[in-house]
Amino acid sequence: MKVANIGSPLESRIFQTNGISLHVILAGPANGKPLIFLHGFPEFWFGWRAQIDYFVSSGYRLIIPDQRGYNLSDKPAGIVNYSIDLLAKDIVGLLNELTNSKAFIVGHDVGAAVTWYLIAQYPDRFIRATILSAPHLRVLIKHLVTNPAQLGRSWYMFLFQLPWLPEVLLHRNGWELLLRVLRNTLPPAVFSDSDFERYQESWSKAGSLTAMLNWYRAPLWYPSKLKFNPEGSRARVPTLLIWGKRDSFTGETMARESLAYCEDGRLEMIDSATHWVQHEQPARVNTMVSQFFA
């Protein structure tokens, strides 16, 4: 499989895990160090296009799934099927299928939320982790309850709780609202027109939009068991947090407070970057991650 602007050969596979089928992109030497990337909303495996060639050339075996509900992966009906516990088990099952070795892991946005859970509950499966642009769950909850500014930044989380209306608003006029949110929170020219077309193709698959929104609905109805267990939610592998100072969704304070939930954590701020650090500053992010994983 060849994709424009990605030089490395890509293998597109379907794997059974945790009772569903996940579409996964594999790249790099089969005997390389396993490195799994977990995308955020509203992306899919393609959100890691600026990382693939770099980490393949560094000798890693890349495992890049479309997570549950996204793109070519299964989209089970019902909010109950998108609890963080199930999302994490999808990834554990995938790793069990693909490797007997511990893996490195990188997550962005809601993919980073899954990463936080995995490195707290399944530390024996991971060597080191990198979190991009997503606070620890307990920090997020605290700021949603006590910080009016964060409430304003997180307006979309509350909109997404409504039935059917978010689907209508996001999809109408050729995905106008969703595209506008991306364009307004990214510097110009970070995404090309063809990139946006690939995203729209992914969102347009049957059941995708509701499944993607169910990631936000499930925590309200089916909260993680870690919500009520501060010690059990601590990251138990060495963890690097990378944050853009211009992030429109989560502020620097949340990044710094999240370090308290890491047994061995460090934070790198990128002054000129927004929420989409791996797209805007791929060379810096790739170098930071590579040095941390070395």
Indicate residue ranges for each PLM-predicted region.
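Flexible "cap/lid" subdomain of the alpha/beta-hydrolase fold that forms the substrate-access gate
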Residues: 1-13, 20-22, 63, 70-106, ...
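C-terminal alpha-helical cap of glycosyltransferases
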Residues: 24, 286-290, 294
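Residue-level detector of flexible, active-site-proximal loop/helix-junction positions
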Residues: 31, 136, 274
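Conserved HGGG/HGGXW glycine-rich cap/lid loop of the alpha/beta-hydrolase fold
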Residues: 26-74
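A short, glycine- and basic residue-enriched loop/turn
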Residues: 44-45, 113, 273-274
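Catalytic histidine-centered segment of alpha/beta-hydrolase-like enzymes
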Residues: 273-282, 286
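Short, flexible hinge/linker loops that cap or flank conserved catalytic cores
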Residues: 16-18, 28-30, 35, 233-235
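A short acidic, amphipathic alpha-helical/loop segment
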Residues: 50-51, 254-257, 284
